[in-house]
């Protein structure tokens, strides 16, 4: 077995065995790729940038683009690290604990760090007149009402200077039939053309929705492990997007 095929195989096994929170069907990688700490196959990745995407879209009418939140636009591992240590030190049960999500919704993201790469992408899209929305697997506060502009929405609006900010689309990490992935429904309902995300399910949901899914690199300091294989499905990857 070649080194590249061996690497893809090993990452596939890790993805299937360890990805505990995402609910969509697991799909093995079929391409070589990179992580934030391993770039040996970077020559085989389909790299894109805010500039290259802007050129591709030149002359086309405005579109709707969606962004995942955690590890895509915000460095928010501190919220998850604290949550695990506080609510379930020995498991991932905290992710299913409403008290934890209430803690996050009550302002934890005031301490999250906006990613520079996300700012560049969002600035580019807004300069074109595109509508930016956010889709997250998080669970909102127990008192949250669908369609409500909550604290997270205001934090993102300020951090990225979002025009015509829309309420956050919360999936509760639960796919809704007939879709297999939790974010697909929101991509379809909002007529999204491009989705940016760091997880495998971001890319697979975009494919299920029949739209363009572009990978953002998860930071090496993220507590969300294992790090995904960026480009592992042959998808485009945003260069220098780990920060």
Curated annotation (Swiss-Prot):
InterPro entries: Acid_phosphat_B-like, HAD-like_sf, HAD-SF_ppase_IIIB_AphA, HAD_sf. Mg(2+) binds at residues 68, 70, 198. The active site is at 68 (nucleophile), 70 (proton donor). GO terms for molecular function: acid phosphatase activity; metal ion binding. Substrate binds at residues 136-137, 183. It is found in: Periplasm. It comes from the Bacteria. Dephosphorylates several organic phosphate monoesters. Also has a phosphotransferase activity catalyzing the transfer of low-energy phosphate groups from organic phosphate monoesters to free hydroxyl groups of various organic compounds. Homotetramer. This is Class B acid phosphatase. It comes from Actinobacillus succinogenes (strain ATCC 55618 / DSM 22257 / CCUG 43843 / 130Z). The lineage of its organism: Bacteria, Pseudomonadati, Pseudomonadota, Gammaproteobacteria, Pasteurellales.
């Amino acid at each position: 077995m070649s080194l590249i095929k061996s690497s893809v195989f090993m990452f596939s096994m890790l993805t299937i065995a360890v990805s505990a929170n995402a609910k969509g069907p697991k799909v093995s990688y079929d391409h070589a790729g990179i992580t934030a700490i391993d770039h040996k196959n970077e020559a085989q990745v389909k790299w894109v940038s805010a500039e290259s995407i802007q050129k591709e879209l030149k002359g086309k009418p405005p579109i709707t683009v969606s962004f995942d939140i955690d590890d895509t636009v915000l460095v928010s591992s501190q919220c998850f690290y604290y949550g695990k240590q506080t609510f379930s030190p020995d498991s991932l049960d905290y992710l299913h604990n409403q008290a934890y999500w209430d803690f996050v919704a009550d302002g934890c993201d005031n301490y999250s760090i906006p990613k520079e790469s996300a700012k560049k992408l969002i600035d580019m899209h807004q300069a074109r007149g595109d509508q930016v929305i956010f889709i997250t697997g998080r669970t909102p506060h127990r008192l949250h009402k669908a369609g409500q502009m909550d604290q997270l929405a205001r934090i993102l609006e300020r951090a990225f200077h979002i025009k015509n900010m829309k309420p956050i689309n919360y999936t509760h990490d639960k796919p809704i039939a007939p879709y297999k992935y939790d974010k697909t429904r929101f991509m379809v309902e909002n007529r999204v053309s491009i989705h940016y995300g760091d997880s495998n399910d971001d890319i697979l949901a975009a494919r299920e929705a029949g739209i363009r899914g572009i990978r953002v690199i998860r930071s090496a300091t993220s507590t969300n492990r294992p790090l995904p294989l960026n480009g592992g499905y042959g998808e485009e990857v945003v260069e220098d997007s780990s920060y």
